[in-house]
């Protein structure tokens, strides 16, 4: 039964392959919960546009030697794409250089009669490729594909095209290479230690199974991987990439030599696999994956999913894992393997026409490429080889980038976690090129998502997809807030804060890290992470052991908690997160021990030792009240300096205790589209009511009265006859985050 894998059942658009025989000889009979949408032959009929997605129960009955057993699968069938009536097309403008080949925009932003803002493909007269022999203005004409709506683009041709630049020197530097570390006594520390135990008990040879199998090396008796990494699955290899990153980040966080030994073994063996691939006919030098080049060949012929499954997505995970092992665990061979693999990508893509690459990246799931632009631009930054930066730009996705350039939110119907890594890549390309456009689209994307597409826990997306701006209360289902989307939003937030230390970015970071990332792990050492955090009433977290994308990012997330606690701008130190932690800033001669208790987020306690005085800024959290206090060595400071949302001070040389008080209490947040739906928060924590009720609870909650009436035990509250807990305290109990205020 466990050997049977049906593919990603969360976003089904195509027919399923439902086998009649199991891998080991069992007979399989299929039963569908709704044959109108999914029959027992695997034929899929998508719901009409506007009627919503359908989650269908599918049962497999296994019969073997007189024994039978049944397994249920949940299949989410996506509704049909809309029939579009256009009311407006956003104007298109482009600059080009005389005598150089350029391409007209492949897409336009459109507005529809249903109030939607979407991106639609353009068919240009005489194609998209242009080369203008003289300077001046030109008007190009085309139409929206399949809609016969006219489109025009104004092209300004200049003698020499100058791209607007922005400085690439970071304003902020992080302590994210082990200088900051967690200290015992918090849920964050527990999560880090338990994930470390999971990594220590993981079989390295099993993680290498698919790679050795593909290149013909001995599998050393290891069992095959399962789930999304099963031998029959086309995404196999992605978890191994996450595992490499997890080992590297774990070593950075705790300096456990056993973890580094595992990472060294993995890199040595993957190096052998890379060498073995190079000796195989039809395999290019430097190639490395959990399968041969066949999926890449098929992608270039536009083979759809599920015949192939995102080969460049898997490659991104492998490359990222290699670079993490080099940067955070100091394994030089990992850098060598990564550069060889990067050159393989360059040689493969540099010979493809622009039109072909655009069509590949536009293919649903098959063309998904994770953060290939990110990892290749990072490889350029680390190696200085311009081929890697050039290749990173091959992954520019105009369908995503163009509306963001125009400062238009056209995210609806985009697969959230497919596109967030591409924006992280835009930031990395900005660091390599200095082109302001890449920075601007990343900044606008962050603003659009965090202002109009996030739930109260910081997570985004329903059924993996972005929906219309402000659609939150109408999309509270079992399939909300994909974990790896938040993982990537935090990565993006980190990169943006590096260049503009906006306090609001750290407010979002704290909210999402605390309530979604920490709240998404299974308690104990299973290593599991929820795929979705269900925000419909009465559901519980589901931990699936199938090597999903969210399992992969979960291998990494819990080793990043200390990375953003502290930062510095020159000699000025920022305290951004309030976790029990320690900082050793050796260059400045500063040591900080933070003793903030999670049960008392209102009191930030810092023990500071410094060889000379220095400026320090402590973030004033978005959840705190107007009144605040500052004590240095027990003496209350009568005056406090507040700048850009930070409590600023000069810390004298020597050893001192700094105590900051930020009033903390209950408060409510409502959803923009259904203002009667609320969530209850206490300081940085989103509180969930323990309840099996699958209808929204109707509650009369006044935050001021709750302060007086709620019974508090640690971070557990009893109020209105209900038990309320932060999400990270809840494991498998059913709960409600949102409820109806009466």
Give short role names for the model-derived ranges:
Residues 442, 506-606, 642, 661-742:
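C-terminal beta-rich recognition modules with glycine/proline-rich loops and embedded aromatic residues
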Residues 1-29, 82-116:
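Solvent-exposed, low-complexity, repeat-rich "mucin-like" stalks and linkers
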Residues 175-185, 251-264, 278, 322-339, ...:
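Structural helix-adjacent loops and short alpha-helical linkers that scaffold large soluble proteins
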Residues 188, 243-257, 316-332, 371-384, ...:
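Well-ordered alpha-helical scaffold segments within catalytic/enzyme domains
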Residues 625-650, 668-673:
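Solvent-exposed beta-strand/loop surfaces of large extracellular or lumenal domains
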Residues 29-61, 114-159:
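Serine/threonine-rich, repeat-prone extracellular segments and beta-strand-based repeat modules
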Residues 224-240, 299-314, 350-369, 401-436, ...:
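Solvent-exposed loop and edge beta-strand segments that line ligand/cofactor-binding
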Residues 160-239, 264-298:
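Low-complexity, Ser/Thr/Pro/Gly-enriched N-terminal "stalk/linker" regions
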């Amino acid at each position: 039964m466990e050997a049977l894998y049906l593919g990603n059942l969360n976003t089904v658009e195509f027919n399923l392959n439902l086998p009649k025989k199991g891998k080991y000889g069992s007979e399989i009979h299929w039963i569908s919960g709704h044959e109108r949408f999914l029959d027992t032959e695997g034929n899929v009929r998508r719901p009409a546009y506007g009627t919503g997605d359908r989650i269908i129960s599918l049962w497999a009955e296994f019969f073997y030697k007189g024994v039978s057993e049944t397994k249920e699968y949940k299949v989410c069938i996506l509704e049909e794409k809309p029939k579009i009536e256009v009311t407006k097309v956003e104007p298109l403008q482009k600059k080009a250089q005389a005598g150089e080949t350029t391409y007209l925009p492949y897409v336009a932003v459109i507005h529809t009669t249903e109030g939607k803002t979407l991106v639609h493909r353009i068919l240009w007269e005489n194609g998209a490729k242009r080369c203008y022999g003289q300077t001046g203005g030109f008007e190009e004409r085309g139409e929206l594909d399949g809609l016969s709506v006219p489109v025009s683009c104004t092209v300004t041709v200049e003698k020499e095209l100058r791209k607007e630049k922005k400085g690439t020197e970071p304003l902020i530097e992080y302590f994210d290479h082990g200088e900051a570390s967690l200290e015992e006594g918090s849920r964050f520390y527990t999560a880090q230690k338990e994930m470390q135990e999971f990594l220590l008990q993981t079989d390295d040879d099993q993680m290498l199974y698919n790679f050795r199998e593909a290149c013909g090396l001995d599998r050393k008796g290891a069992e095959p991987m399962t789930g999304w990494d099963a031998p029959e699955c086309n995404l196999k290899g992605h978890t191994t990439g996450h595992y490499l990153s997890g080992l590297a980040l774990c070593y950075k966080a705790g300096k456990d030599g056993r973890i580094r030994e595992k990472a060294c073994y993995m890199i040595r063996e993957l190096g052998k696999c890379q060498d073995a691939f190079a000796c195989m006919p039809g395999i290019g030098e430097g190639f490395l994956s959990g399968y041969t080049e066949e999926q890449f060949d098929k992608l270039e012929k536009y083979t759809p999913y599920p015949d192939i499954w995102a080969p460049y997505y898997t490659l991104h995970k492998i490359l990222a894992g290699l670079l993490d092992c080099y940067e955070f665990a100091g394994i030089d061979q990992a850098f060598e393997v990564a550069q060889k693999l990067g050159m393989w990508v360059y040689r493969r893509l540099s010979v493809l026409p622009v039109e072909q690459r655009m069509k590949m990246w536009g293919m649903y799931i098959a063309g998904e490429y994770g953060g290939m632009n990110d990892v290749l631009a990072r490889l350029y930054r680390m190696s200085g080889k311009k081929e890697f930066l050039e290749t990173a730009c091959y992954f520019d996705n105009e369908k995503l980038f163009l509306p963001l350039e125009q400062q238009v939110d056209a995210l609806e119907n985009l697969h959230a976690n497919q596109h967030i890594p591409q924006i992280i890549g835009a930031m990395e390309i900005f660091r390599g090129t200095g082109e302001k456009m890449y920075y601007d689209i990343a900044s606008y994307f962050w603003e659009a998502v965090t202002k109009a597409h996030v739930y109260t826990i910081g997570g985004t997306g329903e059924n993996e997809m972005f929906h219309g701006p402000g659609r939150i209360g109408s999309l509270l289902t079992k399939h909300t807030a994909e974990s790896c989307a938040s993982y990537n939003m935090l990565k993006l937030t980190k990169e943006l804060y590096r260049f503009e230390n906006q306090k609001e970015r750290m407010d979002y970071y704290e909210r999402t890290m605390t309530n979604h990332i920490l709240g998404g792990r299974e308690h104990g050492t299973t290593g599991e992470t929820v795929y979705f955090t269900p925000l419909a009433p009465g559901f519980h977290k589901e931990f699936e052991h199938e090597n999903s994308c969210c399992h992969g990012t979960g291998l990494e997330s819990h080793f990043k908690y200390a990375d953003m606690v502290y930062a510095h701008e020159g000699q000025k130190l920022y305290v951004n997160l309030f976790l029990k932690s320690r900082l050793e800033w050796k260059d400045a001669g500063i040591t900080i021990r933070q003793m903030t208790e999670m049960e008392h987020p209102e009191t930030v306690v810092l023990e500071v030792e410094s060889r000379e005085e220095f400026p320090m800024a402590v973030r004033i959290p978005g959840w705190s009240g107007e009144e605040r206090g500052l004590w240095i060595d027990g003496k209350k400071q009568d005056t406090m300096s507040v700048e850009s949302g930070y409590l600023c001070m000069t810390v004298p040389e020597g050893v001192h205790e700094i105590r900051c008080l930020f009033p903390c209490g209950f408060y409510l947040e409502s959803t923009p589209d259904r203002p009667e739906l609320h969530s209850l928060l206490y300081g940085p924590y989103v509180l969930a009511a323990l309840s099996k009720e699958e209808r929204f609870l109707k509650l009369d909650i006044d935050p001021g009265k709750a302060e007086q009436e709620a019974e508090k035990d640690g971070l557990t509250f009893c109020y209105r006859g209900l038990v309320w807990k932060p999400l990270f305290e809840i494991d498998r109990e059913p709960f409600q985050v949102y409820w109806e205020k009466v």
